[in-house]
């Protein structure tokens, strides 16, 4: 499969009348979005111009775990944490459950096993950036790609794949949690979202497809979901995560 075939050049913007939108150079774009009376925080990144990184452990091999420790580490390096969100689902040992690539280095391999829980609700998938181009593909498709990502996180299930919702999502599901995920638009924008109220996976998937304009989107996690985004008034610095995905400058 040709990686470039996954990326379309058509430039589109998907902003709803219910969204409050603001942006300034180097800080990404922040929105508060409402869909079906549910509120979400949304943060957009342009990988052509913004530095999106993935973190798990510091150089000493200790897990960052919280936004505070990551922020303090970056500050000591002369860098700024602009935005952060927990990345893909992790194990009880606080290790990424699937593929985890930082700065081009493979730290955890692709997980193609069968199992129980959201991660293994097939199709699951991989979000990655390679040569400043973002993509989300299902795990099987990823094995066929000849690509060397700068960053990658595997999770599951896929919320949206090529414009189609996951076949095992149902509108009347009573599995309600605070949830976070990531999507990619046709113009190579990366879109992160977190719900402010408990929702089901069907509702979350329709947010990415119908309101945020993402033909592909990946579920990151639920119940433990958190966001650090001062531009949205969100300055939570706690957390107990494995992977953390961050906009750094």
Q: Regions from the language model: what does each represent?
A:
Residues 3-14:
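Bacterial N-terminal signal peptides that target proteins for export
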Residues 46-48, 128-133, 161-163, 184-188, ...:
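Short acidic-glycine loop/turn motifs at beta-strand connectors
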Residues 95-169:
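Active-site-adjacent helix-turn-beta-strand microarchitecture at beta-sheet edges
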Residues 26-118:
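Zymogen propeptides
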Residues 59-60, 141-145, 194-198:
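Short, solvent-exposed aromatic-acidic interface loops
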Residues 95-113, 168-216, 225-249:
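Conserved, well-ordered active-site substructure
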């Amino acid at each position: 499969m040709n990686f470039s075939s996954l990326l379309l050049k058509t430039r589109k913007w998907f902003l709803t009348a219910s969204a409050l939108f603001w942006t300034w150079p180097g800080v990404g774009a922040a929105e508060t979005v409402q869909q079906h009376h549910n509120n979400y925080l949304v943060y957009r990144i342009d990988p052509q111009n913004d530095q999106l990184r993935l973190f798990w452990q510091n150089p000493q091999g200790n897990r960052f775990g919280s936004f505070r420790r990551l922020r303090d580490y970056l500050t000591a390096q002369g860098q700024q944490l602009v935005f952060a969100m927990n990345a893909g689902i992790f194990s009880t040992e606080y290790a990424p459950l699937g593929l985890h690539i930082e700065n081009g280095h493979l730290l955890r391999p692709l997980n193609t096993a069968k199992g129980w829980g959201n991660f293994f609700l097939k199709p699951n998938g991989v979000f990655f950036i390679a040569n400043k181009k973002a993509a989300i593909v299902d795990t099987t498709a990823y094995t066929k790609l000849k690509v060397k990502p700068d960053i990658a996180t595997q999770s599951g299930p896929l919320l949206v794949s090529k414009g189609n919702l996951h076949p095992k999502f149902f509108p009347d599901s009573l599995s309600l949690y605070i949830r976070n995920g990531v999507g990619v638009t046709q113009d190579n924008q990366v879109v992160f979202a977190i719900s402010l109220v408990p929702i089901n996976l069907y509702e979350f998937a329709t947010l990415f497809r119908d309101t945020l304009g993402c033909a592909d989107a990946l579920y990151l996690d639920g119940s433990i979901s958190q966001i650090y985004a001062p531009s949205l008034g969100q300055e939570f610095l706690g957390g107990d995560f494995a992977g953390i995905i961050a906009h750094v400058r």
